[in-house]
C-alpha cells in the first residue's frame, strides 16, 4: 500500500531499509517499466497527516453538538486530546524528523515536509483553541448546572481548604521532589506526557543558595482529578484538579522562599519505534530494547497554561530544543485526557448515552456448538454493533477441545478492563 507520505511508484529517491513499527513499511523502489501508468497529478491525492487532523475535527464536532449528553460531550473532548497526543507522538514527530534530515522534495500530493508541517500546526492550533473554549464556556457550565462541579481555589469552603491541605501533606508531599534550576543542577529529564510544574522563586533556599526557578514533577500515581468526599463536598459530585491543590500548597516545598509563579506544563515526545528489520533476528528483544526509550524521545510539543510568563516559556523551549511554533498555550488542564475518568465516577445516566446492547448474528443466536455452526459456513461478526461474546465462546470451546493443540491471538489496543 502506497501512501502519500511514502515514496510513490515511479518517483526517484532512495528507499529506507529502516521500518517504523505501526507505520507504513516502505519496500524497495519498483524497477523502471515503460509500460507503467504515469504518476497521477497531486490533486488526486490526500495527505495522510492533514486528513488525520480533519478526522479529529469531526470528533470535536460531536463534542460541540449540544444535542449530545453533557458527559458524552466531555468524553468526545477527551478523545480528541488522546488522538492529538498520539498524532504528535508519531505523525508530527515523523514530519519533524524529515525536516531535520533536510527533506525538501514534495510528496505525491504536491506538499513538501515544510508545507505539511506549517499546515498541520495551523489546524492543530485551531483544534486546541476550540477544545478549551468549548470546555470553559459550554461543557463545564453545563455539568455544573447538573450538579457536577470542578471547584477552583477561590470557590473552596474552609472545610474544603482543610481537607485539601490534609490531602496534600498525606498523599502528595511524600512523592514530590522539587528540582532547582541552577548551574549546579542540569535540566531534569521530563518524561513523555507527564504533568510538570515550572515554579518561579524569590529568595534563598535552606542551603543559602539564590534560586530563581525549580521544576516539580507530578508522579503518575497521583490522580489528576480528585473527587471530594461527601462530608466536605458542597454538592453531589464535586471535583478538584490536582493542579489546583499543588498551586495552593507549592510554597510548602520551598521553605523560606517566596513563590511568585507556578505554571503547569507537559511535553510530548517522539514515541515512534525504529527497528532495522533486515538486521534483527529477534523482534521481541529488539522491541524490548526500544520501548524503555519511548518516554525520552525528542520533544515535539510543549503545552503550558496560558498564565506562564514568556520568559519561562522561552526557557523551557530552549531546554527542550523546540521552537515557538511547537508551543501550545491552553486555558485549563494541560492534559484533558485525564478527565475521561469523570463519567465513570458519576452515576448520572441522564447525562450519558443509553447503554448500547449489541446483538448476535442470526447464525449464532441459537447455536449450541460454535464449531458445528462454523463448519456450515463463515460467520461475519461486526463489532461493536454485534456482541464480542462469540469470540470468547470460540476461545473457550477451543480450550476444551482435545484436538486443539494451540491458541494464538494478535492483541491490539485492548480496553483498560480487558
Regions found by a protein language model. Name each.
Residues 17-418:
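N-terminal localization/anchoring segments of enzymes in phospholipid and broader phosphate metabolism
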